[in-house]
């Protein structure tokens, strides 16, 4: 995450300079979504962040944070007590365990968390509302009515997806898993028809041999709105 943000900063988005990364909204605690969390705690601090990181996430984020800070205790202590000019604030974390509803607000944006369905793990999506935009991020989820209601007529819907065509070729045990945990291209087309976002951005794509063009074609069979298959560092 930090390295992608640094690339974005170098490409012309100064707000994503590493030392300015001060807030994190976590959808759920699967390892593929949190493996970069310690990097986001520590690297911006090493690069000059001088205030705690504010983290918002589901139940369990507090324990995960405490364990990570304990795991890196020796590194933190050496940086604070040795020759490195490290401050005593930027490695700290303010943890906010979220419930459905507004979880953050400042003069620029409000953030609303809504529950999604990703197996038995507590999971959320987030809606970001500014004076002139509303952007909704699904997180990992099977179709849920809460997302449809909250996202209606949003400017951008960023939603996970898997290829329905390639899903049919998966082993039965994996079909059962993915059908319960994720959203197919056909299901997402139905969601998009009801939401009518200004732009639908696909992310967390499960291709299984499909291409970006294949995903777009599958969705385009029953949805005629604007759709792109997102990549890191895309700007819309």
State what each model feature region is.
Residues 132-134, 142-234:
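Cap/insert and terminal regions of metallo-dependent hydrolase folds
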Residues 1-136, 214-236:
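Binuclear metal-dependent hydrolase catalytic cores
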């Amino acid at each position: 995450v930090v390295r992608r943000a640094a690339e974005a900063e170098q490409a012309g988005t100064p707000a994503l300079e590493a030392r300015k990364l001060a807030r994190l909204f976590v959808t759920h605690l699967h390892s593929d979504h949190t493996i970069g969390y310690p990097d986001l705690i520590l690297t911006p601090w090493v690069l000059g962040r001088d205030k705690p990181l504010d983290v918002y996430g589901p139940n369990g984020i507090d324990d995960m944070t405490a364990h990570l800070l304990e795991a890196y205790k020796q590194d933190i202590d050496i940086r604070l007590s040795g020759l490195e000019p490290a401050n005593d604030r930027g490695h700290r974390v303010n943890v906010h365990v979220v419930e459905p509803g507004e979880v953050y607000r400042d003069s620029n944006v409000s953030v609303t968390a809504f529950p999604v369905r990703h197996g038995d793990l507590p999971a959320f999506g987030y809606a970001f509302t500014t004076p002139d935009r509303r952007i909704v991020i699904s997180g990992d989820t099977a179709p849920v009515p809460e997302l449809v209601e909250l996202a209606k007529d949003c400017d951008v819907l960023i939603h996970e997806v898997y290829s329905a065509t390639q899903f049919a070729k998966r082993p039965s045990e994996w079909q059962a898993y993915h059908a319960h945990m994720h959203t197919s291209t056909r299901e997402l087309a139905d969601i998009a028809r009801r939401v009518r976002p200004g732009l639908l951005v696909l992310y967390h794509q499960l291709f299984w041999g499909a291409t970006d063009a294949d995903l777009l074609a599958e969705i385009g069979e029953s949805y005629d709105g604007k759709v792109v298959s997102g990549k890191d560092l895309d700007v819309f």
